[in-house]
Amino acid sequence: MRSEWVARRRGQANVTQMHFARQGVITEEMEYVAQRENLPPELIRSEVARGRMIIPANINHTNLEPMCIGIASRCKVNANIGASPTSSGLAEELEKLKLAIKYGADTVMDLSTGGGDLDEIRTAIIQASPVPIGTVPIYQALESVHGKVEKLSAEDILHVIEKQAQQGVDYMTIHAGILIEYLPLVRHRLTGIVSRGGGILARWMLAHHKQNPLYTHFRDIIEIFKKYDVSFSLGDSLRPGCLHDASDEAQLAELKTLGQLTRMAWEHDVQVMVEGPGHVPMDQIEFNVRKQMEECDEAPFYVLGPLVTDIAAGYDHISSAIGAALAGWYGAAMLCYVTPKEHLGLPNAEDVRNGLIAYKIAAHAADIARHRPGARDRDDEMSRARYNFDWNRQFELSLDPERAREYHDETLPADIYKTAEFCSMCGPKFCPMQTKMDAEALSELEQFLAAQPTG
């Protein structure tokens, strides 16, 4: 779809959406996003120019259907997929991608660390995906030196970043905010460093007693991103991995650095979103969102949950969706889903489905709470369908129509029950929605009440 759009941009030193937005240009991607969001194109342009919105759209991902991430637009949901050395491979991950898109993922991250040729897996995912694809390039960089962290060099990392940009990756998690001087701050944590990328870089810094190479080479990464329009997703390497560690000195020190890196990228018109926690008690979520907005000048906030309790193993998609809904309400722009397998194992296709639906609920609830225009229209239509016992319409309006139909038909499978004025919960005699309060009856009641003596 985008081949003609990007053809005339090729060869330019800077092809980012932010660069064009700051020149006053409304790109085809901005026009497309404006239609999807039902917002004025000029608003999209101004938000991208300001840095409050990003349109992750690598010029080499030509089959992409552009979308945006930002406070002015709908709250978005990301789904993580990816093969591992011990489970899954290309075929399974392509099936997960298909399911993720079916159930409403706005972006997908390929977090493959094994299971085959990583370049082959990534290329296949990009070619099959109409939604933006994100990656964490430090994973492949480590794989390129056979997992030996101490042998990893800045050149190895930059080579992988450039290669993934050429392949069409739309945004990359870059863990540039974890500095060597922050490592002692995790001494009193219960769970230390829980970011895989952050852990890799921490081990590298401990081995070499040198500064984080992603930080020292951040300008080199900016130059790569300018050429392909790759967006930064600044990784929170020191995010809390449990409630005990939330909002601590280590997390907030890194957040300040992420703000500095955001402004550095903006100086070169490179798009940025900032990643956030993690595991956060409900009463600290608003603080975390407000603090990110303050430190990072309102760059879009992309949160992993957060989980609001640490004891829901097997149900962390629920624990985290609670936190995600609150974060979205307070201003987070994108929610990274958590599946029931979080902390337990690699998610399968059904886990992807359950995690995504939980997060679509959270994002939608946030949009309603933020009074986004039209956010509640579908809910009101569902309510009308319920009141009219229009079962098929109820299924259609559900976030997961197949599951809604499956649960209804579990007890009342016959077609005749698709027009019945009850379900198996109340049966034919006790459903309160059968009590129709028609206008004529209510008018008569009002007249009766008005005629009653007062006092």
Swiss-Prot record:
Pathway listed: Cofactor biosynthesis; thiamine diphosphate biosynthesis
Entry's Gene Ontology cellular component terms: cytosol
Keyword Transmembrane helix: no
Keywords: 4Fe-4S, Iron, Iron-sulfur, Lyase, Metal-binding, S-adenosyl-L-methionine, Thiamine biosynthesis, Zinc
Residues bound to substrate: N80, M109, Y139, H175, S195, R196, G197, D236, S237, L238, R239, E275, Y302
Extent of the signal sequence: none
The reaction(s) this protein catalyses: 5-amino-1-(5-phospho-beta-D-ribosyl)imidazole + S-adenosyl-L-methionine = 4-amino-2-methyl-5-(phosphooxymethyl)pyrimidine + CO + 5'-deoxyadenosine + formate + L-methionine + 3 H(+)
Domain of life: Bacteria
Family that this chain belongs to: Belongs to the ThiC family.
Protein name as annotated: Phosphomethylpyrimidine synthase
Organism lineage: Bacteria, Bacillati, Cyanobacteriota, Cyanophyceae, Synechococcales
